From Swiss-Prot:
Pathway connected to this protein: Glycan biosynthesis; glycogen biosynthesis
Cross-referenced PANTHER family: ALPHA AMYLASE DOMAIN-CONTAINING PROTEIN, GRANULE-BOUND STARCH SYNTHASE 1, CHLOROPLASTIC/AMYLOPLASTIC
Keyword Glycosyltransferase annotated: yes
Gene Ontology molecular functions: alpha-1,4-glucan glucosyltransferase (ADP-glucose donor) activity; alpha-1,4-glucan glucosyltransferase (UDP-glucose donor) activity
Keywords assigned by UniProt, alphabetized: Glycogen biosynthesis, Glycosyltransferase, Transferase
Recorded name of the encoding gene: glgA
One family name in Pfam for this protein: Glyco_transf_5
Catalytic reactions of this protein: [(1->4)-alpha-D-glucosyl](n) + ADP-alpha-D-glucose = [(1->4)-alpha-D-glucosyl](n+1) + ADP + H(+)
Organism: Hydrogenovibrio crunogenus (strain DSM 25203 / XCL-2) (Thiomicrospira crunogena)
Keyword Transferase: yes
Known role: Synthesizes alpha-1,4-glucan chains using ADP-glucose.
Protein name, UniProt field: Glycogen synthase
């Protein structure tokens, strides 16, 4: 099968969030399962130094907002990506400082709507074999609002490829004014709320993808159900319920890249291990190595006190406010230590910094992001904390399972689908892999942490829990096979 994978970001070329991790891994997984895959993405100014073998393949002209834009399409390769990358080069739209969506002042680029609408038009031309590439896919997979218009544009075509639109996060709707809709020359039949892409007198590119793709997928089975409820759908529950009723909305779990996240080979950790070899000793040594980052006294580093790690954005969605509420009393009442790595809301950063000064040997923080430290925490912590209020899929809990670091999670989205709670029954049957709380409250979080600390003291039970988690299969191959089963049924 020929698959065109359209995305606005891909690791290691450019990354602002989890979409980049998916885009950097899922097309490769298709390729390794013998599919013919091309990835297409904008040629941002920062990308050129990260690619090699660049060659111009074609050029074309795209009309938008009263002007003709000259487009060059290049093919390139990149370390860590095994499929050809088609770069859509439109300098006036994409050769800019800052990240793909934000200017240097942290605000959205004023013309984001035009930028990604034009990119979507180019993708549609490629899909229809009108871009001079002499290649037409059987199926186009698009991702989030930035490529939402592709599916809509292809509904205007005869003999078109099938389309799948994948939702990674409903929180970003791609809302733009009616003037852009007019400037793009889109059909007026689309300017209505029920079967079109109008959303409260704006155009929603996210809604375009949901409404007009042949199939809609999202990144976990539970999130696929959650987004049909108002608290998760941001006003789009009606169209999502319609797609669910049509049998055209499905959740497929993301995977993890075992070339990057693997305790047997991880270049960021000092002591390697596997589920059956060296795990207990290596995790103790990795804990000491992790704690050495903070120049702690030897007595602290050598202590066998439990350490709970957290790596993530310090924002309400991630439940950081709940963590801040329970930290002081857990530190006062138990022997647990916390390691927190992340950046986010300035208030949360300040509060964590103050608590770290108050408990210098019990709470270690790093405000910022460090890839090396993130790996060290996964390998060195005894437990990993992920109390997100919502989480479409989540990756850190998957890393934690792979590293034998049982996660503590709130029951939502992909966290519900990937962590089996350590109840008495699940422990007895060998199914438990972590700890789950069901109410996003300080009481539920604290009691679950206390339960985890109790089990940590029971070494035999704890080692079984670690092994259960490490034996789970959350590979991208597993995810890709599920997508391909869907694609083959469509095509």
């Amino acid at each position: 099968m020929k698959i065109l994978f359209a995305t606005s970001e891909a690791h290691p070329l450019i990354k602002t969030g989890g979409l980049a991790d998916v885009s950097g891994s899922l097309p490769d997984a298709y390729h390794h399962l013998k599919q013919k895959v091309r990835m297409v993405m904008p040629a941002y100014g920062d990308i050129w130094e990260k690619v090699s073998g660049v060659k111009q393949l074609s050029e074309l002209s795209i009309a938008a907002c009263g002007r003709q834009l000259h487009v060059r399409i290049h093919v390139a390769s990149a370390e860590g990506i095994d499929v050809p990358i088609w770069l859509v080069d439109i300098p006036e739209l994409f050769h800019r400082p800052g990240n793909p969506y934000l200017a240097l002042d942290g605000k959205d680029w004023w013309d984001n709507g035009e930028r990604f609408a034009v990119f979507s038009k180019v993708v549609a031309e490629i899909a229809m074999n009108r871009a001079g590439l002499k290649w037409q896919p059987d199926l186009v997979q698009t991702n989030d609002w930035q490529t939402g218009l592709v599916s809509a544009l292809l509904t205007l075509e005869a003999e078109r490829p099938k389309t799948v639109f994948t939702i990674h996060n409903m929180a970003y709707a791609g809302l733009f004014p009616k003037s852009l809709f007019e400037g793009l020359g889109l059909p007026w039949s689309w300017w209505e709320p029920h079967d079109g892409i109008e959303f409260y007198d704006n155009m929603s590119m996210l809604k375009a993808g949901i409404q007009m793709a042949d199939w809609v997928t999202t990144v976990s089975p539970t999130y696929a159900k959650e987004i049909t409820f108002p608290e998760y759908a941001y006003g789009l529950e009606g169209v999502l319920i319609k797609r669910l009723d049509e049998g055209r909305l499905v959740g497929i779990l993301n995977g993890i890249d075992h070339d990057v996240w693997n305790p047997k080979t991880d270049p960021f950790i000092r002591y390697h291990y596997s589920v059956d070899k060296g795990r207990v000793a290596a995790k103790k040594r990795n804990k000491k190595d992790m704690l050495d980052f903070w120049d702690l006294p030897k007595a602290v580093v050598d202590a066998d006190d439990p350490v709970i790690g957290l790596v993530g954005r310090l924002v309400p969605q991630k439940g950081i406010d709940l963590v801040l509420e329970v930290l002081p009393e857990l530190i006062e009442q138990t022997n647990v230590r916390f390691v927190i790595v992340g950046t986010g809301d300035s208030l949360f950063e300040y509060q964590l910094t103050e608590l770290a000064h108050q408990y210098p040997e019990r709470l270690m923080i790093y405000i910022g992001y460090s890839e090396s430290l993130a790996h060290k925490v996964e390998a060195g912590a005894d437990l990993f904390l992920m109390p997100s209020r919502f989480e479409p899929c989540g990756l850190n809990q998957l890393y934690s399972l792979a590293y034998g670091t049982p996660p503590i999670v709130h029951s939502t989205g992909g966290l519900s689908d990937t962590v089996v709670n350590a109840t008495k029954e699940n422990l007895a049957t060998g199914q438990a892999t972590g700890f789950v709380f069901y109410d996003p409250s300080r009481h539920a979080l604290k009691s679950t942490i206390l339960h985890a600390l109790h089990l940590f003291s029971k070494k035999g039970t704890w080692q079984k829990l670690q092994k259960n988690g490490m034996r789970q299969d959350f590979s991208w191959t597993r995810s890709a096979k599920q997508y391909l089963a869907l694609f083959k049924a469509m095509v």
